[in-house]
A protein has these predicted regions:
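Thiamine diphosphate
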Residues: 1-321, 324-488
């Protein structure tokens, strides 16, 4: 007990008398007790006021109800509650509204209006600010299209990112990046190649192999107003920093009701390539544990750069999962590399179609687009949609409108069955209420449940292939019109 030891130290060194210390302790206890009682009075007084309002409204609604006896009992029991909490009040009101379901009177309407107002207040008390509600929310950042002209260079995808990072390091003194192999060699895929030599070790730096400390450094820097990019070398390694991301970063804005911000950007790479430890796509894990963070899943490096621009204008933490197999693919370099933005929460329709909608993201976009071309050659036109971000997810209902048009939908990705594909299905079928527009069962096309096997063969047999997409779509169309699309 440090207080006891401190008292002993004071007495041993004759810094005060026993009587003086006893007086200080007594005064301190009295002060704490008084403040505790005042705090409890303030807290409980508001709840008791709500309780009295609820009791009066239930009694009023009961006057003209066939369930008057039961409603009066509910109100009386609530009135007798010792040290009530809000759950007691709201739970009783909800029971009363159920009893009043067959009634129609002003008392019931007043009780219902009171409950709806309390629902809004309690959402603000207990559920608000999971994401930013400020003017710098990612949903409020204006879209600035990428600009190209006939002279726009065609470069490797990693060079698009290199140009973007160079621009930010040049123009924003708050911006810096760090992670395993980010500094001297310019990251494992060379998006930072040469940038440490140009901008210095303080701006582009290496770290030890310790994901949790990378995340911790990033959170601290972001809290102090800097704009760090903390790199986790591969998406599979995110597990080592997941606890800190979930407990300390994703929940920060919620825990403080927007009072604290740590707009850390976690950069990583994943999805298909080769290898059990380097080609994972555990997006369902991320969706379940990192609510409160933005989750970007760009299909190429140009989209990734635009998302970084958007995030750097916002006050929200995010994770950006770049496509591991896309760094050497050719892309056009935007003329406004440091300014263009990609709107988050807004899917993009990559190909229009009338027969079926395929919803996907990341590396699967190229697979699905190739499959769509093959399907077109046999008379099946699919609409391909890139969700672009999983959190936030399609805030404008673009996917739902597509499904209303095609009446069929497949959700495809590289996560395990029941992972992110199931999340997307729930968001669209339930969240956007399109079930009644479906003419065929909604389906998912995920990867296998195991880790991706090694080699190109392992990739082919572990992850959805072009043939898998074609056959999945064809099987649905066979069900629709077996004469035109006979069974394979």
């Amino acid at each position: 007990d440090c207080i006891k030891k401190f008292r002993e130290y004071i007495l041993e060194n004759e810094l005060a008398t026993v009587d003086a210390l006893d007086k200080i302790e007594a005064e301190a206890k009295a002060h704490v007790k008084k403040e505790k009682e005042a705090a409890w009075s303030d807290f409980s007084g508001e709840i008791k006021k709500e309780l009295n309002e609820a009791v009066a409204l239930i009694k009023s609604a009961a006057q003209d109800s066939t369930r008057k006896v039961v409603l009066d009992q509910l109100a009386d029991e609530l009135k007798k509650t010792i040290n009530p909490i809000r759950k007691d009040v709201v739970s009783t009101v909800r029971k009363a509204l159920l009893l009043l379901r067959f009634d129609s009177n002003s008392g019931k309407n007043e009780l219902k209006a009171w409950y709806e107002k309390q629902t809004e207040l309690n959402h603000d008390r207990y559920s608000s600010h999971l994401y930013s509600q400020s003017e710098w929310s990612v949903l409020k950042i204006d879209e600035v299209p990428a600009e190209f002209n006939e002279k726009s260079a065609v470069v490797d995808g990693r060079e698009v990112l290199q140009a973007f990072f160079d621009n930010k390091l040049e123009n924003d003194p708050r911006f810096f990046a760090f992670g395993e192999d980010v500094g001297k060699i310019g990251d494992v895929n060379q998006a930072f190649a040469g940038l440490q030599a140009k901008h210095g070790e303080w701006r582009v730096s290496d770290t030890s192999i310790r994901e949790c400390t990378i995340i911790g450094q990033g959170i601290g820097a972001a809290l102090r107003g800097l704009r760090p990019i903390a790199e986790i070398q591969y998406l599979d390694y995110l597990l080592y920093g997941l606890q800190m991301l979930s407990d300390d970063l994703a929940s920060l804005q919620y825990r403080t009701k927007g009072g604290q911000k740590a707009p850390l950007i976690v950069r990583t790479r994943g999805h298909r390539l080769e290898g059990v430890w380097h080609a994972g796509s555990p997006m369902g894990m991320i969706l379940s544990t990192l609510r409160g963070m933005v989750v970007c899943v760009p299909r190429d490096m140009t989209q990734a750069a635009g998302m970084y621009n958007t995030l750097l204008k916002s006050d929200e933490p995010a994770i950006v999962v770049e496509c591991l197999n896309g760094y050497r693919l050719k892309e056009r370099l935007p003329e406004n590399i440091g300014e263009f933005t990609v709107p988050l929460g807004k899917p993009e329709i990559l190909r229009e179609g009338k027969d079926l909608t395929i919803v996907t993201y990341g590396s699967m976009c190229r697979i699905v687009m190739d499959a769509a071309q093959e399907l077109s050659e046999i008379g099946i036109e699919v609409e391909v949609i890139d969700v672009q971000t999983l959190l936030p997810f399609d805030v404008h209902g673009i996917i739902g409108e597509s499904v209303k048009k095609t009446n069929r939908v497949i959700f495809a990705d590289e996560d395990v069955p029941g992972g992110a594909s199931a999340f997307m299905l729930q968001q669209v079928i339930e969240g956007q209420k399109v079930f009644r527009y479906l003419d065929s069962d909604p389906q998912t096309l995920p990867a296998k449940a195991h880790r991706p096997a090694y080699s190109s063969d392992g990739d082919y047999f572990s992850k959805p292939s072009i043939e898998d997409v074609v056959e999945k779509v064809y099987s649905i169309m066979n069900e629709v019109n077996p004469k035109t699309y006979p069974a394979l």
